[in-house]
């Protein structure tokens, strides 16, 4: 106990000294770099952006420094959210808004971000302290509350609509990294009402699968368009939690899902590559399914239905482009003075014999190959002589 008290006193002393230096505008710790006003592509050990700026030199990103103009809100600073915030900070995002009401616990140490000495701190406070040390160029705004309560929900909507890099402007993207459906539905409602593009992410309860999803209100399916069973059945998810039972958590799956999410964010903000509307991950089979989901006209969210109607009007007002008909040019062969002809080595009868029946399929679907009908193998049938192996060997020696 005395040792613990001494450690806590030492920590308090360090924090008091750090607070004193911050108030005096001094550098808090040795080794902390000063802020960088302009990103540079100069390849030197002291440049934290040289590897990122190399993306422009290699033709991947047209203007990487544009990332400093964007604001991203991360809701949920847990296994996925904390790693997502760290990746965006290292990438040099302009501003991060962090929302979470939970505290750091020792049970969180199997994740990739928090450290044991941060136990007891709010997750947003611990995250801001670590992230600010990683990259002082990024602006941070943290909110330690539950967004699903009435008062906090209104404040949450206010911040994502006015908390951009330039105060009074909306954020560029909202990232849902929460672990419960109630919070997801709150984010979904807010973004539908504000017409705010957002990305949803999640990891399964058994920790071996996850997904990310880009949601554009009115254009793609929102979270309420195709809700999980627990939401569609109006089940209180709190009743599903049993005492002494918790969801599994693998740092590997958390890292993979966070990586997919941030990669999609970068492609969306910096306009390179193909942005995925839905990307899944199955760790058991290393399977990455992709798809795009259309909105549900009977969605339970009235703001989603409203945005669907407005999107249809925009599409109808857009000038229609005439389909470009490509005229096939006739192939003109040169004179064949030698009379050379290309003849297939396989006859039509052989091709027909090597192919099997084609099943009836819906329009637009074709089989990659068919399996030929196998015929019984013709040949001699050897009768069973009921002789032992030794007797057969003796007969062979006498031949």
From Swiss-Prot:
Task: Please report, in chain numbering, the residue ranges of the motif UFC1-binding sequence (UFC).
Answer: 384-399
User: Principal localization?
Assistant: cytoplasm
Pfam families named in the record: ThiF
Where would I look for the motif UFM1-interacting sequence (UIS) in this sequence? 331-343
Q: Which residues form the active site?
A: 246 (glycyl thioester intermediate)
Source domain of life: Eukaryota
Residues annotated to bind ATP: 79, 100, 123, 146, 180
Give a GO cellular-component term: nucleus
Query: What keywords are assigned to this protein?
Result: ATP-binding, Cytoplasm, Endoplasmic reticulum, Golgi apparatus, Membrane, Metal-binding, Nucleotide-binding, Nucleus, Ubl conjugation pathway, Zinc
Q: Where in the cell is it found?
A: Cytoplasm; Nucleus; Endoplasmic reticulum membrane; Golgi apparatus
User: Where Zn(2+) is bound, by residue?
Assistant: 222, 225, 299, 304
Q: Which GO terms describe its molecular function?
A: ATP binding; protein homodimerization activity; UFM1 activating enzyme activity; zinc ion binding
Region named Linker: 344-374
| One GO-annotated biological process of the protein | protein ufmylation
Q: Which family does it belong to?
A: Belongs to the ubiquitin-activating E1 family. UBA5 subfamily.
Give the domain section of the comments: The UFC1-binding sequence (UFC) motif mediates interaction with UFC1.
**Record function comment:** E1-like enzyme which specifically catalyzes the first step in ufmylation. Activates ufm1 by first adenylating its C-terminal glycine residue with ATP, and thereafter linking this residue to the side chain of a cysteine residue in E1, yielding a ufm1-E1 thioester and free AMP. Activates ufm1 via a trans-binding mechanism, in which ufm1 interacts with distinct sites in both subunits of the uba5 homodimer. Trans-binding also promotes stabilization of the uba5 homodimer, and enhances ATP-binding. Transfer of ufm1 from uba5 to the E2-like enzyme UFC1 also takes place using a trans mechanism.
Quaternary state and interactors? Homodimer; homodimerization is required for ufm1 activation. Interacts (via UIS motif) with ufm1; binds ufm1 via a trans-binding mechanism in which ufm1 interacts with distinct sites in both subunits of the uba5 homodimer. Interacts (via C-terminus) with ufc1.
Name under which the protein is recorded: Ubiquitin-like modifier-activating enzyme 5
Which species is this UniProt entry from?
Xenopus tropicalis (Western clawed frog)
């Amino acid at each position: 106990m005395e040792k613990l008290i001494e450690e806590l006193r030492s920590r308090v002393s360090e924090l008091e000294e750090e607070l004193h230096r911050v108030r005096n505008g001094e550098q808090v710790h040795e080794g902390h770099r000063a802020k960088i006003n302009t990103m540079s592509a100069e390849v030197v050990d002291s440049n934290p952006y040289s590897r990122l700026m190399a993306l422009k030199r290699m033709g991947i990103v047209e203007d990487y420094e544009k990332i400093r103009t964007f604001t991203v809100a991360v809701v949920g600073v847990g296994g996925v959210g904390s790693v997502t915030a760290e990746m965006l900070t290292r990438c040099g995002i302009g501003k991060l808004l962090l929302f979470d009401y939970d505290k750091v616990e020792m049970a969180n140490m199997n994740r990739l971000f928090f450290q044991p000495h941060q136990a007891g701190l709010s997750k947003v406070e611990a995250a801001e302290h670590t992230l600010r040390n990683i990259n002082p160029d990024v602006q941070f705004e943290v909110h330690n509350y539950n967004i699903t309560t009435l008062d906090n929900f209104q404040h949450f909507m206010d911040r994502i609509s006015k908390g951009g890099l330039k105060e009074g402007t909306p954020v560029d993207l909202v990232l849902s990294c929460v672990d419960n459906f109630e919070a997801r539905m709150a984010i979904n409602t807010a973004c539908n009402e504000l017409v705010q593009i957002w990305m949803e992410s999640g990891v399964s309860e058994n920790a071996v699968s996850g997904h990310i999803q880009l949601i554009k209100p009115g254009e793609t399916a929102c979270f309420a368009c195709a809700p999980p069973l627990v939401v569609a059945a109006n089940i209180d998810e709190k009743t599903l939690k049993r005492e002494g039972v918790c969801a599994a958590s693998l740092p590997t799956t958390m890292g993979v899902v966070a990586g997919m999410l941030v990669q999609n964010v970068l492609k969306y903000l910096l306009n390179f590559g193909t942005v995925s509307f839905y990307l899944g991950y199955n760790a058991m089979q290393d399977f990455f399914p992709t798809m795009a989901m259309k909105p549900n006209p009977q969605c339970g969210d009235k703001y989603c239905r409203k945005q669907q109607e407005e999107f249809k009007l925009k599409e109808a007002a857009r000038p229609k482009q005439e389909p470009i008909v490509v005229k096939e040019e006739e192939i003109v062969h040169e004179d064949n003075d030698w009379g050379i002809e290309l003849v297939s080595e396989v006859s039509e009868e052989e091709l027909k014999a090597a192919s099997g029946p084609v099943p009836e399929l819906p329009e637009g679907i074709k089989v990659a190959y068919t399996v030929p009908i196998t015929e019984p193998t013709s040949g001699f049938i050897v009768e069973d002589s009921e002789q032992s192996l030794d007797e057969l060997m003796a007969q062979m020696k006498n031949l």
